[in-house]
């Protein structure tokens, strides 16, 4: 009995230790609720057979800048951000960009590896839009496109032009490029039907011809009349203006 009493403080210590371990409250990750969807579309920007002029490295920087802005502003303004990135001519990934309010950080949640949708066709683009809706059925959609482009001229029309690290709609050769009509029909025939805005982070897409072709499938068109350098929009500065209730004035002013 005396021996037990001498060790009683030690026994009590271990009881308290194990009791405190059981009483630890687990961290529960919480995320913002969302009521609208931003689809960030970054297709393959090289050629069908090579990586020439591809912008993948710049897209990676764009995504990092978006994450930085989200963390600085501590949220996504109730916007479900779905991102498609083509890694090469055959492989792509779809992921969700979301804000962990518990840990106060932006996280990437992979939705589909080897996602496909890299080949260029109107039906392929329509199926991709429907895939996005299946991931994020909010009923309100916006579209941000980063790639190469030739404005309103048909696919392949810039094949004789000097190639520089700038943007346009699609890849670097005719096999990887979309006509504006492909985009219009893909939106109209998909479950999206119409989007709040289309932003071309590309060259030469702000013109009457493009705006007229897309007038029935978008409320707003955000684009440039001239070249857009490979770095694209400074998302680290303006991404918060794109999310939620879009502030077009601050968005555009922040770019220039």
For the regions a protein language model found, what residue spans apply to each?
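Short, solvent-exposed loop/turn and secondary-structure capping segments
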Residues: 50-52, 93-95, 153-158, 210-211, ...
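Structural recognition of the beta-strand scaffold that forms the well-ordered cores
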Residues: 37-42, 80-85, 141-145, 196-200, ...
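Bacterial N-terminal signal peptides that target proteins for export
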Residues: 1-9, 224-225
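Solvent-exposed loop/turn segments at secondary-structure junctions
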Residues: 44-47, 87-91, 117, 147-153, ...
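A short, glycine/acidic-enriched catalytic loop
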Residues: 150-189
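Active-site-proximal C-terminal subdomain of hydrolase catalytic domains
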Residues: 195-256
